[in-house]
């Protein structure tokens, strides 16, 4: 899987909102009496019906999702609007509020936790309130697919911010009221019910939405946090030494005790495989839509391509080491693989990666062209030197890099220089 340098909890902390000090107005609720002196003016998307309050709420929610998601004032604005609609609905005995209302309300409550990551009690309160809201929605709208998406998002964020963020290398599973792998299983089970519900309804439009795709990214973030857990703490002993090699060695040496809450997840391929399988299914569901988003499809294909490239790293390294490193002369295996086995596995994985990277190609984004060229070069390296297969791959990669370099005024010159003799 493609890994990130920052997991969800750190990214949330890094994107602390800037406090708004001026008196402003939330345009979605012009009649609302607010005791807060901090208000915000929001320009809603053009397609939003200004005369429909639920449509306005959806517009506020969409505005937040399309932003940097670093403005607590906007999240509070969504919550205040939900509170107003709820009070108004209760007092005037209107028709029950729709499922999407409960979904937006619950997600906004959970989002507040990302602005208070240092206050664990508040984080817990926000998630309790969010899950209560989504369950209320499900009571009134059983198996509603939007509510199931919201519940999955909230559960995954809760795992990251409430359960993983406070952990240290010394943490013990006995300190937690629930095991994290069981919480993760429960969250993923809810997402599987989203897939099942879409299949039952023969309506796959829920997957034509970046908010649904965020679920797979949230899982990827969690797995990334687990994979790298503790590494940032290594070397924080007050020493002024800054030796890159020592730092690399320290990062590689981090191991979790069997009693650590993250041990089971870190030492299992189960969740990586789940991510891969359900990302494939996501793509399948997108392709069932006649007018599905090309941007979303490219993004899913890019992620799949990167995941196969990452999986190829170990066998690729084994092959190049056994074949070209004189220090390993006479050694038959590394990582349980012979040279031939490593070569075959690497070729298969990078070929799969190339297929998805080509589907992810965007004519308006040269970076996507370069991803294809780099994968071609890696695949070429797995063939015999000067073989036809290698030369063909190198030539095609060179053409792609030259084109990308030309349209970006030399941005990829280094990649070209590395390829050309």
From Swiss-Prot:
Keywords: Nucleus, Transcription, Transcription regulation, Translation regulation. It is found in: Nucleus. Residues 235-252 have a biased composition (Acidic residues). Residues 1-41, 230-259 are annotated as: Disordered. GO terms for cellular component: nucleus. One of its GO terms (biological process) is regulation of translation. Required for correct translation termination and probably involved in regulation of hypoxic gene expression. Belongs to the ETT1 family. This is Enhancer of translation termination 1. It comes from Candida albicans (strain WO-1) (Yeast). The gene is ETT1.
